[in-house]
Amino acid sequence: MATAAQPSLELALELMSKVPLIGNISQSTHKIPIQCTGLTREQDGHNDWMHMIRAYYDFQVDDRFQPTKDLAGHVDLKRLVQGRAGAVFWSVYVECPKGENDFSDAVHHASMRDTFQQIDLLQRIMELYSDRMEMAHKADDVMRIFRSGKCASLMGAEGLHQLGNSSSVLRIFHRLGVRYVTLAHAKNNLYVDSATSEAPIHHGLSPQGRDMVREMNRIGMIVDLSHVSEKAMVDALDVSLAPVIFSHSSAYALVPHVRNVPDHVLDRLKQNRGIIMISFIPWLTNKDPEKATVENVVDHVLHVGNRIGFDHLGLGSDFDGMPSHVQGLEDVSKYPNVVAAMLQRGISTENVEKIMGMNVIRVLREVEDVAASQKGLLPVLEDAVPQLWDDGIRAYVKKLYPHAEHDRTGASETTTVDKAIEKDV
C-alpha cells in the first residue's frame, strides 16, 4: 500500500483516474472521468504518431487501425487509453527540404502540400476514433473535452519550412486547428536558424522571422522554440508579446545538447510566462542515452522547477518521433510512470497537476488573450505576390474606374500605372 511519504504508481493512477486501468478497451465501454479540480490526465506537448502513420503505414488508415488492434511504434488507441492521455498536441511534421540554406519558394512547395496531407490524416484519425478523441481549438475546448472523458487533440507544425514561405498559409493552418508552430526543425529556414544546422545564417531570427513571430502573436498561434538556435531563442523572447513554449526540450545544465535550453534562456522564459515541456528523448535526457530513465526525466523537471518555478513546466514526449525510448517510458501507456516518479521525488500534487496540463492550458488561454488584445493594432503580415497584370492593363482599369480606390494608403510617388495613363492621355 502506498504511504504519504512514498507515493507509488498505484497512487498516481488513483490520482489520475477513479476507474481501474483499462487493459483491453474492447472489454470496457467506460470513459475515464476527469477531476478538473484535482490531478487531470496527462497532457503531451509533442507526439509524432501522424509521422509514424505516414512513414511506416504509408499514409493508409485501414483495418489495422481498428480500436482493438496493436500498432507498431509508441502509440495506438489502446495504449493512449491505458496511459490516460487527456490532451495531446499531435505534430503534423514533415521533413525539411533537401540541401542547406535554399530558401526559395519552389523547394518548399512539397513541404506545404505534405503538411496539408498530415492535417487531413489527423482529421481522418479523429473521425475513426470520434468516441475517444476530439479536436480542440481553444483552451475552453480542452477543458470541455477533458470533462467528457475524451482525449483533447490539438495540432502543432514542426518548422516554418512547412508554410512554403507564406504567411497566408500560416493563417490557413490556424483556421484548420494548428495551434503551435515550431520555428525551425533540423535545418535553417527563411525565418530562423536551427540548432542542428551546419552553420547559422541569420544569427538568430531574420527580419522575416521577427515579422512571423508578430503575426503568430496577432492570430493566436503559439510560438514553439524547440529545435531553434540559442540566439534564436533569445530573439524570439525579445519579440513575442505572448508566452512561448518549448514543446519537447530539456535542461542544458543537465545534458549539454544544442536541443536543450540553457539556464539564462529559462530565466527569460519565466519573464515571458512561457513553459518548457520536458522531453522523453534519451539523448536529451541523459549524457549516456542508453542509461536514460524516467528518473532522469524528473531530474530535468526538478531543475527547471527549482530554478524558475513549476508554473513553467509541461511534458512533451516525442513518442513516435525517436527510434528508442527512456527506460520506464516505453510508450504512451507509461505516462502514469512519470506522474508516480514526480510524486515520489516530492513534487506536490498541485505542481504535478500544473505540469500534467494546467500550465499549457494557461499558455493557450494567454496566447488567445494577446491575440484578442492586439486585434486592429498589429498589421496583417501580407505575402509579397508578384504583379500579375502589366502596367498597361492596370492603367486601363484605373482609367475605367476613376473614382475607385487605387493606390495604397500613404503612396506619394507617381506610379508606373499613373505614368502609363498620362502617356495614353
UniProtKB/Swiss-Prot annotation:
Its EC number is 3.4.13.19. The keyword Hydrolase applies. Its cofactor is Zn(2+). GO terms for biological process: proteolysis. It catalyses: an L-aminoacyl-L-amino acid + H2O = 2 an L-alpha-amino acid. Pfam families: Peptidase_M19 (PF01244). Keywords: Dipeptidase, Hydrolase, Metal-binding, Metalloprotease, Protease, Zinc. Induction: Expression is positively regulated by the thioclapurine cluster-specific transcription factor tcpZ. The keyword Hydrolase applies. GO terms for molecular function: metal ion binding; metallodipeptidase activity. It is an enzyme of class 3 (hydrolase). Zn(2+) binds at residues 46, 48, 158. Substrate binds at residues 185, 259, 318. CDD domains: rDP_like. Signal peptide: none annotated. InterPro entries: Metal_Hydrolase (IPR032466), Pept_M19 (IPR008257). Belongs to the metallo-dependent hydrolases superfamily. Peptidase M19 family. Dipeptidase; part of the gene cluster that mediates the biosynthesis of an unusual class of epipolythiodioxopiperazines (ETPs) lacking the reactive thiol group important for toxicity. Firstly, L-tyrosine is prenylated by tcpD, before undergoing condensation with L-glycine in a reaction catalyzed by the NRPS tcpP leading to the diketopiperazine (DKP) backbone. Afterwards the alpha-carbon of tyrosine is oxidized by the cytochrome P450 tcpC to form a hydroxyl group. This is Dipeptidase tcpJ. The gene is tcpJ.
